[in-house]
């Protein structure tokens, strides 16, 4: 008797436990291979797990939907699809709905709309439901006779609701001719879509765009709705606002909470344990990447630079994830981005919220190739091609370039670095120059990163083909990956810019001639096909820095001192062009040979001093004519050329060649590089009688001779100045430089958008100049900044020492305004592993 009492008590306790367990609903799943729908007959009349006994069993739920008035049409096909597609899963798993009075999906959708109205943070919004129905033998989405809600005080939303009722969109995957519209894309893709302003849509993307403009509606969010545990899309909830919707997360979270309240859901799913990565070693490269992006933005005034990586790699969840696309989804690394322009910070936040699929935008395209991807205007993309195109349009961003790099720590973690060009850089020629400058930044690629080789790209393509992965389709897009590099000329870019596919703008990184060659990075994004191979650096699987160093070493060995001497007469820039290297490389080679300054650069400094003396002499009345001091400077190249020619003749085989007639080069054509080295080429002409010196005459001798003559002339001029200064009766009203002008410098400094003017004593010390400027701009540590001056050729030249300041003053004294124009920028010298080989291009 006691046993039966205890037994009945245990039954009551078990029933209470089960009631509590099933109160909110749960899943049952078999583990021994059996199936719920194939349960063996039981001796009892009713099975304890009879599917018909559950309030929200799949069969019962869908049958109720299919017989519910107008809404019955929207699930007629889904009932069949669910029984066929999910049959195996439903046999293994079963959903037990929560206790209490059951409600159909239709009722819950109505409740969801009411909940969204209460949960949403937006005021002045229209909430409407789009559901699939059968119409004319086709499945279409409609909002007619479906639940909706809007602000009763806003007539614009009421008008837009009446307009939306008259629209329907295709709900069939194979119906390519019909317009899907925003609700159709969300329903078919099972992914949410949002825009800060629907007015940015094209009419083929959003057929209601003209009505939206008339009704003055802005931000729009559309999300798919699912049942718990099901992948069948029940419909689409669209939220239309009268204000711009910049941030997605607040509204999305509100809608998701409203759906969960009625046991529905949207697309945001927890990361499946099987897809969670455990290798976070890629984070070791993030500090170097951050520094790389910072240097690029501060050097070239870029508004934004971002780092993209796969969501799977960083275990990141998002609203655009589902089981099918998770491995193709990419997102930004929030702590590896740099915002150079505070006005685009919200755009960066939107990028962080809105993940991309590989193939979307320049960043998504870069994941599918091993070269850079460039677009002259990302705001021209369709929404399906680049979901953030409307945000780019809103914040005035146009040009963008991205390149894919691989982490050597893991061998599989890929980063895509995305750079947005300045907002005012919208001209194609300006963009080309900016890309040319940005390409030099890639010479600073950290040693922990490398590019993807062609072989690795081929292997990835084979895997994609085997798995039959479908990436977002981009109409008329060029092939994004393959063995052939994607190159385009400037004319092709201009033609492509007139189309709606800015992704056709060419890639300029090209592979090697052989399959095993490294991956070439050309000096600058050169759109011409005749790039000089000597001006290229090489990426390889071992990292850019190592290969670039090997290539530099090989090039340096082939340029001897004798080769350099042949070009001493001209400018350093001309010499670099003739030799086939960049000016910075030539300067490094000169330093290896003990040449600290290009010879004509030295003589030019002396020329500036002589010109200053000449001005002083000319300003004194009573002096009969100027002294001919300019002839020494002008004749310097002739002296070198005269010594150079016999040396060349001695090396040639008989008979000796006829005298060479050199063409005239522009007079005093100056060129300044980033480290303040300057070159000049003066007017030269070599006649037939200029080769009379013996062949043994050395170029160094000519240099010494010229230098001695100049020193002698300078010495005599100094004596003349001393004599003139000792005169007691100098006529009044002379143009002699006043002591005030001699003691003070007029300086104009630009720092970003700020400009200051100042006068300071002529100490000609760089330290004093930096201190004075730092005091005006309230900068404590001036070592983190670079200071440049504008020379007579309108080029910015870096000030690095007191000698540079002296030359800067001498040069600026020759200008009519006698004002020194300076530019203050964030220094790139704090950049790790910066090589002198890229200094010139960085400031070019």
Swiss-Prot record:
GO terms for molecular function: DNA binding; DNA-binding transcription factor activity. Residues 641-709 are annotated as: Disordered. Residues 744-827 form the PB1 domain. GO terms for biological process: response to nitrate. Its main location: nucleus. The keyword Transcription applies. Residues 540-626 form the RWP-RK domain. It is found in: Nucleus. Residues 661-682 have a biased composition (Low complexity). Residues 683-695 have a biased composition (Polar residues). InterPro entries: NLP, NLP1-9_GAF, PB1-like, PB1_dom, PB1_NLP, RWP-RK_dom. GO terms for cellular component: nucleus. Keywords: DNA-binding, Nucleus, Transcription, Transcription regulation. Probable transcription factor. This is Protein NLP4. It comes from Arabidopsis thaliana (Mouse-ear cress). The gene is NLP4.
């Amino acid at each position: 008797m006691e046993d039966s009492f205890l037994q009945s008590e245990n039954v009551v306790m078990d029933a209470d436990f089960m009631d509590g367990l099933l109160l909110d609903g749960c899943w049952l799943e078999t583990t021994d291979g059996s199936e719920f729908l194939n349960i063996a007959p039981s001796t009892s009349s009713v099975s304890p797990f009879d599917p018909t006994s559950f309030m929200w069993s799949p069969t019962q739920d869908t049958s109720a939907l299919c017989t519910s008035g107008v809404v019955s049409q929207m699930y007629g096909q889904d009932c069949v699809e669910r029984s066929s597609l999910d049959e195996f899963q439903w046999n293994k798993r079963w959903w037990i709905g929560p206790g209490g009075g059951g409600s159909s999906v239709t009722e819950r959708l109505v409740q969801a709309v009411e909940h969204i109205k209460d949960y949403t943070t937006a005021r002045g919004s229209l909430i409407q439901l789009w559901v699939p129905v059968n119409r004319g033998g086709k499945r279409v989405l409609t909002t007619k006779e479906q639940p909706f809600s809007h602000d009763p005080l806003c007539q614009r939303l009421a008008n837009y609701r009446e307009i939306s009722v008259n629209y329907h969109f295709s709900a069939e995957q194979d119906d390519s001719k019909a317009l899907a519209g925003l609700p159709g894309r969300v329903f078919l893709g099972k992914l949410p879509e949002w825009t800060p302003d629907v007015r940015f849509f094209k009419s083929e993307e959003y057929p209601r765009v003209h009505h939206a403009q008339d009704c003055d509606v802005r931000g729009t969010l559309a999300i798919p709705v699912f049942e718990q545990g099901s992948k069948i899309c029940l419909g689409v909830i669209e939220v239309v606002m009268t204000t711009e919707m910049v941030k997605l997360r607040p509204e999305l979270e509100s809608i998701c909470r409203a759906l969960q309240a009625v046991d529905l859901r949207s697309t945001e799913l927890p990361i499946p344990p099987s897809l969670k990565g455990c290798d976070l070693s890629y984070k070791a490269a993030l500090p170097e990447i951050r520094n790389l992006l910072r240097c690029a933005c501060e050097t070239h005034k870029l508004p934004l630079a971002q780092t993209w990586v796969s969501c799977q790699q960083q275990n990141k969840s998002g609203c655009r994830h589902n089981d099918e696309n998770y491995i193709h989804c990419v997102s930004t690394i929030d702590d590896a981005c740099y915002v150079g322009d505070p006005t685009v910070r919200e755009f960066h936040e939107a990028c962080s919220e809105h993940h991309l699929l590989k193939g979307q935008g320049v960043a998504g395209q870069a994941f599918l190739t091993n070269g850079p991807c460039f677009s002259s205007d990302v705001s021209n993309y369709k929404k399906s091609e680049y979901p953030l195109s409307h945000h780019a349009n809103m914040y005035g961003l146009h040009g963008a370039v991205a390149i894919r790099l691989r982490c050597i720590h893991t061998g599989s973690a890929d980063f895509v670095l995305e750079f947005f060009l300045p907002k005012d850089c919208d001209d194609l020629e300006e963009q080309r120059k900016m890309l040319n400058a940005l390409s030099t930044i890639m010479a600073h690629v950290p040693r922990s990163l490398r590019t993807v080789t062609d072989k690795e790209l081929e292997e990835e393509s084979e895997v994609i083909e085997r798995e039959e992965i479908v990436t977002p389709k981009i109409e008329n897009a060029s092939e994004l990956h393959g063995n052939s590099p994607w190159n385009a000329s400037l004319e092709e870019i201009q033609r492509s810019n007139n189309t709606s596919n800015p992704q056709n703008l060419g890639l300029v990184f090209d592979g090697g001639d052989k399959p095993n060659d490294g991956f070439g990075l050309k000096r600058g994004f050169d759109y011409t096909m005749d790039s000089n191979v000597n001006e290229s650096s090489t990426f390889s699987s071992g990292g850019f820095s190592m290969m670039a160093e090997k290539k530099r070493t090989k090039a340096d060995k082939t340029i001897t001192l004798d080769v350099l001497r042949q070009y001493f007469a001209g400018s350093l820039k001309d010499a670099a062009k003739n030799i086939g290297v960049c000016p910075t490389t030539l300067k490094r080679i000169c330093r290896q040979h003990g040449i600290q300054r290009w010879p004509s650069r030295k003589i030019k400094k002396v020329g500036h001093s002589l010109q200053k003396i000449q001005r002083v002499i000319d300003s004194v009345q009573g002096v009969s004519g100027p002294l001919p001091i300019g002839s020494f400077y002008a004749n310097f190249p002739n002296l070198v050329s005269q010594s150079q020619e016999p040396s060349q003749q001695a090396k040639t085989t008989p008979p000796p060649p006829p005298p060479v007639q050199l063409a005239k080069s522009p007079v005093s054509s100056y060129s300044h590089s980033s480290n303040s080295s300057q070159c000049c080429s003066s007017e030269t002409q070599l006649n037939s009688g200029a080769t009379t010196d013996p062949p043994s005459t050395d170029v160094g001798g000519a240099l010494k001779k010229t230098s001695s003559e100049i020193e002698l002339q300078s010495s005599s001029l100094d004596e003349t100045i001393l004599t003139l200064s000792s005169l007691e009766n100098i006529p009044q009203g002379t143009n002699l430089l006043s002591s005030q002008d001699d003691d003070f410098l007029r300086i104009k400094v630009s720092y970003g958008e700020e400009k200051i003017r100042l006068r300071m004593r002529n100490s000609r010390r760089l330290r004093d100049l930096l201190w004075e400027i730092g005091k005006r701009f309230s900068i404590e540590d001036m070592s983190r900044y670079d200071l440049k001056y504008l020379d007579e050729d309108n080029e910015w030249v870096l000030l690095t020492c007191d000698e540079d300041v002296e030359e800067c003053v001498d040069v600026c004294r020759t200008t009519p305004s006698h004002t020194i124009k300076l530019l203050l920028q964030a220094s790139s010298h704090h950049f790790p592993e910066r090589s002198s080989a890229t200094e010139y291009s960085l400031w070019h």
